């Protein structure tokens, strides 16, 4: 609905979206950008801006950059740290940026190479506003109304399920009770991007939620089209890519047979990946064409400026890549033979080992074909949980999975800096896949960190991470419900505009990922799916294809799990001897201050008395005691429990004599007695008998059990006892 406004340049549009008004304002803010929109949903306000560079570049891909920025003022917060301003993007910001990028990128024309930036600034945030969906819609609409050649609207929704009811855009509280959380994006006709974390959901229930969410997406896409038809700018014309036919024929005649021989050879040469062989061949081809023109004065190559020389060599590279792509795809579609010789449903060979690293708390090495993940588990106290301080309330995150992809994993030289967006995204996917099989905090009161080191990579490294990590967790004694395996599925279609024939690929490798049409990562147990992520490189796929991919992936997942179970099929009964031992006790919240004491004196005394044991006290009365030695943990637990058994003045207790106390003249003047394990009191020599005692040892013996009365407890908690006053 278009609403009239006093500002002639400002256009306002509204739609009812899940019982709330989604309002869009255009024309007042960021007017110098190619396209900009302000979106209002509940209390969330997001500014989405699209900007395009003027010049086409010589790259073989679209230089698209997506930034999703959560300004902390949007939630009424001042940033922490010394500078008190926003710094590097948070994990959540990176994940949302990747989500928008993966959804929108496939919808651009392959011939459009201008630099494009999409900026999404969260200016006001409603905790239940589902900001990622609003930002994606804003990015799509900003592109649609701009002069940037983007023509197909895309929208997204979140779907949850509580009981038998499917819910669109569940609130934070609903997410906690939902059996899954799905983010779905697509056009009015097909799906573009899917992400989900779930509690072992079945394939049928997942497909049901996909269909349910796509109906809402269709309405939002139609809404965007109506706006673009009213106020959209004239689009920049995309220059047609005129293929140099003579050059194409020449390269094909020279190199087609050699490329085909490399791709159809079932054996790798000296274990070198075919992608590396093709890369070397392409480098030689480019060098040959460069030398050809440098040595031939009649040609005009030397007369071209540097930029046009790059464009010419880029043309050579495009033709070479097209030949590789054509051979791979036609061989798969027509002969059902993949670059490594497998058929479409075949999984690469799998080997696994556990306990690779002796001093770590748990480790596993998972190898599938040319991809290898080493997963390491570290257990810590709950105070070592990660603190998440973003637009929502501050929370502690006890399970962390970090994915590292060093350059040597693909035989390259690289810089080792902060984790990349890709590393953060892959780590988060693996983390989601494992969360639902982890024990609760009450059953296993540890913080858990898993690190996946990718040591070799030829596709599906994120899924190898899931397999290695679940095995490492079991080896560390973390009581998982079951093993989790992941597999990456691919798709080759005959026509990206109208799919008539297609082949689904199991366990894709690097070449198939690069030259294929989808990368569909699916993780789960034998019961159901725990996480998935779909990246589509074409305009979309139908629900029918989606269903068949899931069916094949389930069979593959079970095969992989069967291989993993040969190495370890259940969690160990105990954690590693090098891992800290922990116990939890529950006390009344009002007793917490008694344990802590004035200025922390009591808790510090307990810690010092018990070999610097770690003690975490929660507001709800849970106390976690952790130490490398289980005996220390047990002693600390007993001490705290006995400490809370209130020693009262005038009460009589049965005690054990522990030791005598002597003065400077080495004469005994009292005894230390144990009231409860960990709780001690002092008996002065004058309080032993009704007559004068010269030596304590004349009346008492070490280890003797006697009755005493508590006669005093001073402000420091020290207890005075009397033997002679027991019957008074």
Curated annotation (Swiss-Prot):
Residues 650-724 form the S1 motif domain. It is an enzyme of class 2 (transferase). GO terms for biological process: mRNA catabolic process; RNA processing. It is found in: Cytoplasm. It comes from the Bacteria. Residues 580-640 form the KH domain. Its cofactor is Mg(2+). GO terms for cellular component: cytosol. Mg(2+) binds at residues 513, 519. Keywords: Cytoplasm, Magnesium, Metal-binding, Nucleotidyltransferase, RNA-binding, Transferase. Involved in mRNA degradation. Catalyzes the phosphorolysis of single-stranded polyribonucleotides processively in the 3'- to 5'-direction. Belongs to the polyribonucleotide nucleotidyltransferase family. This is Polyribonucleotide nucleotidyltransferase. The gene is pnp.
């Amino acid at each position: 609905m278009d609403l009239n406004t006093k500002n002639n340049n400002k256009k306002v549009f509204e739609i009812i979206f899940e019982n709330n008004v989604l309002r869009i304002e255009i024309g007042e803010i960021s007017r110098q950008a190619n396209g900009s929109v302000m979106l209002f949903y509940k209390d969330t306000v997001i500014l989405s801006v699209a900007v395009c560079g003027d010049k086409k570049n010589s790259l073989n891909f679209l230089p698209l950059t997506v930034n999703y920025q959560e300004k902390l003022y949007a939630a009424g917060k001042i940033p922490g740290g010394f500078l008190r301003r926003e710094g590097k993007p948070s994990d959540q910001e990176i994940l949302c940026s990747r989500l928008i990028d993966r959804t929108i990128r496939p919808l651009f024309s392959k011939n459009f190479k201008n630099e494009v930036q999409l900026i999404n600034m969260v200016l006001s945030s409603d905790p239940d506003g589902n900001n990622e969906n609003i930002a994606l819609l804003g990015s799509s609409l900003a592109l649609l109304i701009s002069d940037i050649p983007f023509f197909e609207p895309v929208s997204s929704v979140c779907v949850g399920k509580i009981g038998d009811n499917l819910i669109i855009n569940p609130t934070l509280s609903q997410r906690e009770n939902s059996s899954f959380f799905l983010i779905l994006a697509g056009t009015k006709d097909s799906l573009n991007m899917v992400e989900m974390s779930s509690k072992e959901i079945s394939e049928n229930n997942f497909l049901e939620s996909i269909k349910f969410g796509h109906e809402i997406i269709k309405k939002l896409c139609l809404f965007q089209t109506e706006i673009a038809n009213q106020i959209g700018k004239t689009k920049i014309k995309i220059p047609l890519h005129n293929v140099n036919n003579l050059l194409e024929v020449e390269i094909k005649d020279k190199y087609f047979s050699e490329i085909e021989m490399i791709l159809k050879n079932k054996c790798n040469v000296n274990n070198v990946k075919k992608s590396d062989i093709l890369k070397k061949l392409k480098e030689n081809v480019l060098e040959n064409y460069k030398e050809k023109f440098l040595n031939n004065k009649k040609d005009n190559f030397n007369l071209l400026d540097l930029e046009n020389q790059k464009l010419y060599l880029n043309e050579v590279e495009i033709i070479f890549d097209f030949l590789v792509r054509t051979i791979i795809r036609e061989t798969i579609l027509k002969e059902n033979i993949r670059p490594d010789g497998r058929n479409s449903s075949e999984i690469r060979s799998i080997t696994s080992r556990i306990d690779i690293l002796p001093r770590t708390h748990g480790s596993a090495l998972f190898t599938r074909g040319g991809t290898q993940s080493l997963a390491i588990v570290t257990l810590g106290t709950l105070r070592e949980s990660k603190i998440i301080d973003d637009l929502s309330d501050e929370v502690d995150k006890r399970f962390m999975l970090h994915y590292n992809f060093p350059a040597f994993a693909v035989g390259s030289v690289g810089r080792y800096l902060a984790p990349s967006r890709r590393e953060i995204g892959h780590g988060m996917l693996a983390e989601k896949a494992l969360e639902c099989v982890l024990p609760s905090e009450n059953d296993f009161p540890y913080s858990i960190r898993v690190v996946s080191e990718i040591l070799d990579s030829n596709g599906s490294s994120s899924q190898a991470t899931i397999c290695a990590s679940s095995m490492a967790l079991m080896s560390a004694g973390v009581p998982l419900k079951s093993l989790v395996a992941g597999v990456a599925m691919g798709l080759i279609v005959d026509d990206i505009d109208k799919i008539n024939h297609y082949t689904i690929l199991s366990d894709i490798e690097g070449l198939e990922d690069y030259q294929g049409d989808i990368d569909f990562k699916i993780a789960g147990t034998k019961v159901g799916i725990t996480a998935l992520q779909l990246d589509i490189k074409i305009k979309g796929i139908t629900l029918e294809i989606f269903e068949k991919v899931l069916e094949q992936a389930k069979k593959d997942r079970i095969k992989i799990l069967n291989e993993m179970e040969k190495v370890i099929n259940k969690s160990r009964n105990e954690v590693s001897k090098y891992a800290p031992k922990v116990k939890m006790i529950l006390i009344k919240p009002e007793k917490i201050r008694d344990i802590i004491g004035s200025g922390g004196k009591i808790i510090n005394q307990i810690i010092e008395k018990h070999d610097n044991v770690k003690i975490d006290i929660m507001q709800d009365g849970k106390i976690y005691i952790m130490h490398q030695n289980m005996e220390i943990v047990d002693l600390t637990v007993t001490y705290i429990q006995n400490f809370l058994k209130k020693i009262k003045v005038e009460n009589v207790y049965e005690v054990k004599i522990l030791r005598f106390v002597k003065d400077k003249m080495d004469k005994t003047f009292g005894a230390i007695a144990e009231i409860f394990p960990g709780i001690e009191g002092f008996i002065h020599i004058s309080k032993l008998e009704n007559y004068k005692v010269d030596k304590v040892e004349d009346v008492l013996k070490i280890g003797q059990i006697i009755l005493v009365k508590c006669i005093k407890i001073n402000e420091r908690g020290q207890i005075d006892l009397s033997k002679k006053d027991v019957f008074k």
